[in-house]
Amino acid sequence: MKKVLLTGMNGTVAPAIAEELRRRGCEVAPWDRGAVSPDDRQAVARFIREVKPSALVHCAMGSAQWAEDMARVCAEEGSKFLYVSSASVYGTHQQGPFTVYDTPEPSDDYGRYKFECEQRVRAANDQAIVVRIGWQIALRRGGNNMVEHLAQKQEEHGHIAASTEWFPACSLLDDTARALAGALDGAPAGLYLLDGNPGWSFWQIAVALDRAMQAGWEVRENRDFRWNNHMVDKRLGMVSVADLLTRTWAR
């Protein structure tokens, strides 16, 4: 049985990955920050060596130093290391669709942070897997996901303003978890982009989610925000958000 050490279990993505890994028969060991501080570099190294994971998946927020330290120890111990990054590394002055050959130019602190983590991870561990993901969609309320954002906008304003000129990187959370878990089963080291959006606008996605969930939202079309941060990379086999949502509302 594979043992996977997983950070970020209080977030949105890590619990979905944990569920998928357990479904595949893996043992999941959550990183408890209360027991092992990310700021204690010796404790970090000691903990990884004690757990002896076959892989470590890093989803949590934390310092770039922590990400680098974990990547380095995994390289020394022969454990796979997967860092979950973000489409936010691309600045709003850059226009997609993006491929792995497009160099990020982050325009905010979060994007700069994620890009720094990527660079330090790959410098510390040349066998690391780095995966940039987009906005996650869970077909339910709660957590940091698109449905929760849309539902809150509906509650606050009585409608949802959605641009037809914004093409966001996004994917269904469960599909993201499947792809990330699958990457541990033989994906070569390197950079990957994980995006299930086939090219839909934010307005199209919001309308489709309203229909799929029978949410009763009022989605108003506008052109106020213009950006394409869609990412293109077919290697991890993402399912189209359009296909998944169409299937959901057709049931």
Protein language model regions, located:
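Amphipathic terminal alpha-helices
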Residues: 2, 21, 234-251
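N-terminal Rossmann NAD(P)H-binding glycine-rich loop of SDR-like oxidoreductase domains
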Residues: 2-24
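SDR active-site strand-loop-helix element
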Residues: 7, 31, 59, 81-87, ...
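Conserved glycine-rich Rossmann-like NAD(P)H-binding loop of the short-chain dehydrogenase/reductase
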Residues: 26-35
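NAD(P)H-binding glycine-rich loop region in Rossmannoid oxidoreductase-like domains
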Residues: 36-77, 89
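Catalytic helix-loop patch of NAD(P)-dependent Rossmann-fold dehydrogenases
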Residues: 94-131, 138
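NAD(P)-dependent short-chain dehydrogenase/reductase
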Residues: 119-168, 175
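Mid/C-terminal beta-alpha module of Rossmann-like enzyme folds, strongest
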Residues: 158, 179-231
